[in-house]
Amino acid sequence: MQAIQMTIPNFRLSKIEDYLYTLDEMKLVNQIGNAYSLAGDNEKAADIFYRLLQYMRCHLQEMVTSNRMLPLVLYNFARSLDLLERYEESARVARNGKEACIKYGHYQVLHSCLEIEAECDFFLGKKEESAERYREAFYICKVMRYEDDLQIIRNEAQKYLDIIF
């Protein structure tokens, strides 16, 4: 909070939409949401990511800077909703994140959006869709050499669907 208050002295999380942000300030707001999530307050994190998405949709519809941030914020929002066991919402947001990655050509969180969508689909009883999303996430991680994430996907796919990669 102190970092963003250096450039926006009256910044309040409850009023995210009341300010104009630089790309770096949007990254700070995103990191504040991540800090709440890591501390276990996923409800607060989800609210921060939701407000940041609303801000981005209102102020930065087609700007290049928002296009880089959009997939990341959608992923973080989906992750928070997943941790809150709000699977339908989380799957929808993760799909939006996947589409944003593809639309804007920013693939850093594509595999993560697919993994969240796969997990949510599993908990929603959509096992075939879940298996397909895990496969997609697995092969993206394999191609990109994301070894840590590859192992997470292997473990989840085996645990939930008895799929061995």
Predicted stretch roles:
Residues 20, 27, 65-68, 72, ...:
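Residue register of alpha-helical TPR repeats
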Residues 24, 31, 69, 76, ...:
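"A position-specific structural signal for the A-helix of alpha-solenoid helical repeats
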